[in-house]
Amino acid sequence: MNSSDYSMYFSAKTMMGPNSARILEELFTKYPLHLTEKDEVLDLGCGTGLTSLIIAKETGAKVYANDLWIRAEDNAKRFEQWGVGEQIIPVHEDANELSFDQKRFAALVSIDSYHYFAGKINFFENKILPFLKNKSVVLIGIPGMKDEYSGRSEELLSEWLGDEAHMFKSISQWKKIIGNSDRIETIKVWEMDCFNIAWNEWFATNHEYANGDKKYFEAIIKPYTCFIGVYIAIK
């Protein structure tokens, strides 16, 4: 995958934070998804569907684009405009109450959203794992704390994030939160390389939220935070 192939979709209308396409590109480079048009992927916390578009184009699979904040009807219109209306199904459900059939998905992808709803121990095993097929793959890319500042998110980030600072966790914390279910074959968690470019492309949109983030970048965001990649192979 080359995220530059999708640069025409990078705008203040489609981006809701640091460029999700760059985060997804790094995940796909390290752990490519080998899927077919018969496979189904859940894009959990898809936002305006930019990641769903890329997943659909890169894998050929059917994508279920789920987000709680963006109306399914709005994403459906976008997918039609992008020419992928038949390949991507927009969904509007709470990640805590997903209603899909069990063992349905060959892969789950979640970019810049998993930390909002999944920061409790046993969430993955109880709320996500039931919907994953045997031999499926999970790819997650989220903002978090550099490991040397583990457990200090509220102390260090509250000026920027307010009440949401507690959502930023370190690599070691995420390993513990995801757990070691009997169905997990492999789990890899690492600090991602796409930090600067993802943030810079967000700032380039001139979105009001991007401008707000930019004020804190040098003093808070850059010194203490990172993007965390997660790869999970299911037995």
Regions found by a protein language model. Name each.
Residues 1-35, 50, 200:
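Conserved class I S-adenosyl-L-methionine
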Residues 42, 48-97:
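Class I SAM-dependent methyltransferase SAM/SAH-binding core
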Residues 109:
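A conserved beta-strand element that flanks and buttresses the S-adenosyl-L-methionine
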Residues 115-117:
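A short His-aromatic
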Residues 122-137:
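A short glycine-rich, Lys/Arg-flanked "PGG" loop and its adjoining helix->strand segment in the class I
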Residues 143-165:
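Short, glycine-/aromatic-enriched active-site segment of Class I SAM-dependent methyltransferases
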Residues 166-182:
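Short alpha-helix
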Residues 188-235:
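Conserved Class I S-adenosyl-L-methionine
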